[in-house]
Amino acid sequence: MTIKESFEKYKIHQLQLDPFGVCNARCWYCPVKYLGNPESGKEVMSIELLEKIIKNLIDERDKEDGLVAKSFGGFYTAHYNEILLYKHFEELLKLCQKYKLCFIVLSNGVPLTPEKVDLIAKYKGVVNGICLNVPAFEAEVWSKRSGINIKQFDKLISNINYAREKLSFMVENKSFSIQVNGSNEYSFSDKGGWLDKGVDFPSDMDLDPINGELATQTKIAQELFPNMQVFSVPSLIDRAGLLDSVMTNKNAIERNLKANDPTKKVVMCGNGREVGGRPMGWLHVNASGDAFLCCNDYEFDFKFGSFKTQELADFWGKDEHIAKVEESYNTICRNCASAIFE
């Protein structure tokens, strides 16, 4: 199937919309620590542009044969940023309530202040999921791994406690969770994992799978918040090669996806394969209103449209869009753990 045929077959099922592309953390496993947030994503999206984008997608969904799937009803806000720092956060909630959309908050927890929690509770049902990405629950370890001043640690714990009480209904239905990112011995290729260490991998990290850092910090979180869903994530990725100096998936990609055959080509994205993968089944929009390739297109190198001057139908699946996907299959996607090779 050609890329053009794929656009004809698949609708947009998911949206990643990032109205403010800045993060206050510098987590050790994230490009923000090493590269900073992309400059073109640091805008504060206006409410007018935000509503234009949302209305455009709703209109396409409700058309007889629009570009957006009939099942579309929400989005993610997660291009290495903190949606809770968006100064129009309440207006975002109001817009979603108006258009009957919901979204998921991914946060490091420090900006999840009581004021933001109260807003989430006020517009109940708009935020249908909260996942806190917290790498540790001992102050010194947390500060070192998150890149946030240790003085903020008590605020983090206080925020979580307030939120789990105020949003108890989300705790009960398991839509409010804590994700502890890290590594253990089984993360690495010599033990069957998909990672290899880079020169900047934290040398002080205890990788014992039972008593090491990840296991210990996860256990502490479970003890601090016994009624919450807490899970560890030892399977980190290198963001299509951006984190090579820290950790890399390249050897695993060569071994597991290409079968050590350099002639194999990318034919599709396996992240959401059932809806066409990220390039076809998802729409990604940054704070400048630009449509770009996917969550691993960190610097927005593969832009193909702008909601500031265009509507979705002006660029989606058009020649420039197809050319950008073709280019990505020969470049960034070859270093991505979600690529499908043939």
Locations of regions flagged by a protein language model:
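The −1 position to Zn-ligating cysteines in a subset of zinc-ribbon hairpins
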Residues: 22, 26, 265-268, 332
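Short, well-ordered beta-to-alpha junction loops that form the rim of enzyme active sites
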Residues: 180-183, 233-236, 287, 296-297, ...
